[in-house]
Amino acid sequence: MNLEGTSGGILQKEFWRNRIQYNQSQKDILQSWFQHDPFPDKAAREQLAKEIGVPESNIQVWFKNYRVKQRKLDYKCFSEKDQTQGHDQSQHLTQEYLPKEARQKQTFITWTQKNRLVQAFERNPFPDIATRKKLAEQTGLQESRIQMWFQKQRSLYLKKSRMEPMNLLVDDPNERPDATVGWHPINLFLPTDSSHYFSCSHSSSGHETLPPVLPSTQAPWDPFRFHVSQGPNVMIMQPTQAVQEGEKSDQPLIIPNHLLTLPILTKDLDTPTPFWLQYQEEHQNHKEHSGSGVPQVKSHSQPEPEHREQQPLNLGQFDISNILQRWDEICQALLAEWDPLKGTH
């Protein structure tokens, strides 16, 4: 580009034509002023022009050139420094201009520092600021970084503690907790102790079992009330649900290990009568006397014969639907006979 055809080229020519050679005293005055103010305004430049006898425009150019010269000298001195010192300084400048989040991400914890922090966390998961400052002096980390580490460690500890109960339920990692806890088969015979089990056979499956029936005298009589006692994480299956699932599958139906407590009014608590034995006897006696299909409630003032043996009851002739139907009839009959004003005693 031709400088002679532009205004910049004309000014440059005039500058070189009117260039002034400064003596040492003038340079000293200008340099001392530059140290005081590198960007003097027009009034200051006019005052300097009167002192050294140089036009104000030349003084403005001198300050501009001297600023460029000082920048080059500073850059040269910075590049000639030692490589290690220069690396440390550049890293310091980089850390200075990086945002706070980026500086925190670049801070890593060594193995020794982590061990010391873990020991402090085991002693106190919630350290105060004095403890964190003491750890910062011992580990060489910032107090804010230590505070952040403790917060993350506490959150990880809470997640781990929530997962531990599920792991304790399973001994074998290949097994599921709900498939291994609280599911046990029930014997198909009636024992002679106070826990009376009953079973039934269905046309589709002969391995279906029902939960045990126990007498209960602690709660007021309620024909629609029953109590279920079970362990943790055990699924409760109702008898109707068990029948439906048993009909759909050919596999043996196993009821969860829980007790279905039914209220049975008996006077002799040492030798209680099995519910289905009592029902069968009452049903037969009622048919002989009245011929009706609704069973009558047996008076619990009459003592049970002591010589009667409790034989295992073969309920093979009963169907599941018949058993459930008889149960509904018994509940209705007991509800009709029950007087809430008299109570159960």
Swiss-Prot record:
InterPro entries cross-referenced by the UniProt entry: HD, Homeobox_CS, Homeobox_regulator, Homeodomain-like_sf
Recorded GO CC terms: nucleoplasm; nucleus
Residues annotated to bind DNA: 15-74, 102-161
GO MF annotations in UniProt: DNA-binding transcription factor activity, RNA polymerase II-specific; RNA polymerase II transcription regulatory region sequence-specific DNA binding
Assigned protein family: Belongs to the paired homeobox family.
Main location: nucleus
Protein name in the entry: Double homeobox protein B
Keywords of the record: DNA-binding, Homeobox, Nucleus, Repeat
Gene source species: Homo sapiens
Gene3D superfamilies in the cross-refs: Homeodomain-like (1.10.10.60)
PANTHER family xrefs: DOUBLE HOMEOBOX PROTEIN B, MIX-TYPE HOMEOBOX GENE 1-RELATED
PROSITE patterns referenced in this protein's UniProt entry, alphabetically: HOMEOBOX_1, HOMEOBOX_2
Subcellular location: Nucleus
Region Disordered: start-end pairs: 282-314
Residues of the signal peptide: none
Any GO BP: regulation of transcription by RNA polymerase II
Family annotation (SUPFAM superfamilies): Homeodomain-like
Amino acid composition bias (Basic and acidic residues), ranges on this chain: 301-310
